[in-house]
Amino acid sequence: MISCPVDTLIASALLMAVVLLIRVPVRRAFGPSVAYALWALPAIRMVLPPLPEELRQGGATPITQASELVYAAMAAPAPVAAPVIEGVDWNAFAVFAWAVVAGGFLLFHLGQYALFRTRLLRRACAFDRVGGVRIVLSPEAPGPLAFGVLSRYVALPADLDSRYDADEQALALAHELGHHARGDLVANWVALGVLALHWWNPIAWAAHRAFRADQELANDARVLRERGHDAAHAYACAILKAAHGGAIAAACHLHTIDDL
């Protein structure tokens, strides 16, 4: 029973390793959006059904003739009752420990996000609304950021006018609205779910960091494609001014210090 989840974890980890190896060449050849899309492969593998038992075992040769059954029964030695030894079911213990840590990981990020959202919105004031996305100003926002899946927000720092000129403000807002339009906030939660199941796996941690970097690069490319490369200087200035630490994994920040 344990082999199917283990097979899934191994297969998805191998896909993560493959994407880590090819993401840079793919980005150079086909663009950042294609490289970002590669990260769907490990997540899709996590929800695919396991291979049929006969394929995983390589297919056993059945005994088809009655005479073979009789011969096999006569030739088989009489079974010897093995002594019953009560002990720890280490497989069950390992599954339990894995599930506890995975659940704790998700609960931590859910709690962190809930506290962050409450603190940010408590002192926020409405600024604008674009489509279904509410734009707010908050002194708790370290820089422009997008968050929320059901209730969608873009938060801008309260000192927006003093930190960014008009062009930089427009580009920063376009970047964050792009995260909502592309479904990146949903992707962040899916990625956290995959990482929770792979909490023990260093490949998954490296893959998660690369996934977030590719997400930002793909969104940057979209903004520059829509606004034109003449906006590159103002966009770079907005990114530098917005860079900060302490990012929330479930949100999309304009850029963090680690990204730079």
Range-by-range predicted roles:
Residues 46, 148, 154, 190-205, ...:
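Hydrophobic, aromatic-rich membrane-embedded alpha-helical segments
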Residues 171-172, 176-185, 189-200:
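Catalytic glutamate of the conserved HExxH
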Residues 1-132, 143, 149-152, 160-162, ...:
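Hydrophobic membrane-embedded segments
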Residues 54, 111, 174, 181-182, ...:
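Short helix/loop segments within enzyme catalytic domains
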Residues 155-173, 207:
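Short pre-active-site segment immediately N-terminal to the catalytic Zn-binding motif
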